[in-house]
């Protein structure tokens, strides 16, 4: 894929991680060319600092655009953030119209408030002006405060219900968006994150994480920049939101644990390598290598020994993991199951073996025996690609159902499968020998 050219239109605070000082490094970290157009220059951002300097750059916007037009420049994406006046909103609308191409995507973060209040520099009419820019957006990235002000709705403190958020999604249809991601949403005490809707497909979702005590400046810009970088890398909305949430939460955690002065923003720099890795994996996806040789069986057995000993270490009785690997997932049992009709696939990313899956066709459904990933590749949305492989193989055999078993206290896996469309259909208690028993739920999936 050719590198896309992004223009970030924000202010620049010389000290304090926010706006352009986070947008440029984060978006560039995933290989996207990021040009900048500063709307103002501040000595520091305005949160927690006094005596800061502020130079408005409104008068520079059109001369800069005129020079770019003379060079024949267009941009594949625009990412707008803090705009300090109605005039800047109008100028940015013109900029977008003049410098877009047929494939341009418009990302708007309507920075103007938080926690139910507008920032002090904005009057009560400013949200109406920002609405005009939002009508040009393909992807809108407000917090709930900003969205309520623009829609003329009363801001309510959380926790929220999904019905309330769904109502907000419907109200936001007025902007004619393709996608919306709303930050600062909580459905239960101690959890906070982002919700999203793809208006083109109707798909909705949420990504919630543990709340961290305190208020951290610049996190909206960190999140928005990470989201833009992921979406511009051709990653799904669901995975892009997850990556952006985890990147932001990781930045907050590092800052909280270090005891750093929160006025200077969050420590996002240390997480750029992991952010790049997650974007690369999600963008490239995984490849599947069918297991049909003894050497490949040995590779699967090696992964099973490694992954099982790590994953099940604190979940099974002493000695049970080693017993189960030897009985079910060592070389000979895997080879025997393949001889009986099971299909095994090695999962690969970047040329490396990262996991495996195994399944068997029965009369009218598929039994999914194994889906295992190395620790560093869990939680990256890869299970959806594995399930899609199984679904496609099943449909090729005229089968529309699958099932699997999950340990009844493995709530994380159960919830993940439920999100993928599985339902709990029963229980199974299986004596596997040597005094061990597996107590599982049976989960079924129709497609």
Predicted regions mapped to residue ranges:
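Charged C-terminal helix
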Residues: 238-285
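Conserved N-terminal subdomain of the carbohydrate kinase-like
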Residues: 2-108, 112-120, 269-280
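Short, small-residue alpha-helix embedded
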Residues: 214-237
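Conserved phosphate/ATP/ADP-binding segment of small-molecule kinases
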Residues: 121-204
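Conserved glycine-rich acetyl-CoA-binding loop
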Residues: 216, 352, 374-388, 395-397, ...
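Acetyl-CoA-dependent GNAT
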Residues: 285-376, 387-393, 397, 425-430, ...
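Conserved catalytic-core motifs of GNAT/GCN5-like acyltransferases
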Residues: 403-407, 418, 423-441
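Short pre-catalytic strand/loop immediately N-terminal to key active-site residues, enriched for Gly-Thr
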Residues: 14-15, 204-218
């Amino acid at each position: 894929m050719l590198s896309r050219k992004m223009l970030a239109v924000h202010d620049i605070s010389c000290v304090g991680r926010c706006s352009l000082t986070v947008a440029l490094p984060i978006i560039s970290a995933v290989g996207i060319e990021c040009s900048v157009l500063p709307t103002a220059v501040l000595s520091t951002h305005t949160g927690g600092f006094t005596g800061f300097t502020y130079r408005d750059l409104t008068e520079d916007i059109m001369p800069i655009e005129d020079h770019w037009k003379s060079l024949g420049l267009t941009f594949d994406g625009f990412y707008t953030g803090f705009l300090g006046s109605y005039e800047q909103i109008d100028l940015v609308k013109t900029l977008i119209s003049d410098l877009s191409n047929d494939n341009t995507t418009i990302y708007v973060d309507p920075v103007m408030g938080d926690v139910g209040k507008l920032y002090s520099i904005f009057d009560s009419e400013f949200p109406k002006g920002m609405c005009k820019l939002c009508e040009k957006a393909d992807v809108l990235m407000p917090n709930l405060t900003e969205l309520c002000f623009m829609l003329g709705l009363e801001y309510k403190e959380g926790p929220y219900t999904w019905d309330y958020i769904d109502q907000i999604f419907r109200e936001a249809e007025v902007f004619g968006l393709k996608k919306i991601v709303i930050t600062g949403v909580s459905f239960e005490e101690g959890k906070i994150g982002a919700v999203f809707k793809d208006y083109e497909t109707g798909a909705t979702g949420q990504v919630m994480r543990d709340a961290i005590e305190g208020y951290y400046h610049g996190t909206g810009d960190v999140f928005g920049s990470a989201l833009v970088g992921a979406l511009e890398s051709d990653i799904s909305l669901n995975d892009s939101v997850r990556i952006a949430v985890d990147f932001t939460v990781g930045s907050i955690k590092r800052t909280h644990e270090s005891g750093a002065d929160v006025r200077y923003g969050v420590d996002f720099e240390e997480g750029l390598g992991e952010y790049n890795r997650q974007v690369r994996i999600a963008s490239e996806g995984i490849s599947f290598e069918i297991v049909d040789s003894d050497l490949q069986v040995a590779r699967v057995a090696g992964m099973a020994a490694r992954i099982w000993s790590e994953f099940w270490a604190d979940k099974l009785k002493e000695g049970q993991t080693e017993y189960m690997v030897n009985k079910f997932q060592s070389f000979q049992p895997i080879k025997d199951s393949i001889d009986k009709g099971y299909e095994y696939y090695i999962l690969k990313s970047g040329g490396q073996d990262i996991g495996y899956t195994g399944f068997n066709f029965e009369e009218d459904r598929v039994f999914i025996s194994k889906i295992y990933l190395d620790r560093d590749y869990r939680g990256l949305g890869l299970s959806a690609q594995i399930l899609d492989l199984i679904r496609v193989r099943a449909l090729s055999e005229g089968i529309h159902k699958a099932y699997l078993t999950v340990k009844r206290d493995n709530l994380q896996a159960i919830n993940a499968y439920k999100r993928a469309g599985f339902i709990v259909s029963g229980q199974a208690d299986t004596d596997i020998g040597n005094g061990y028993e597996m107590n599982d739920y049976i989960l079924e999936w129709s497609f």
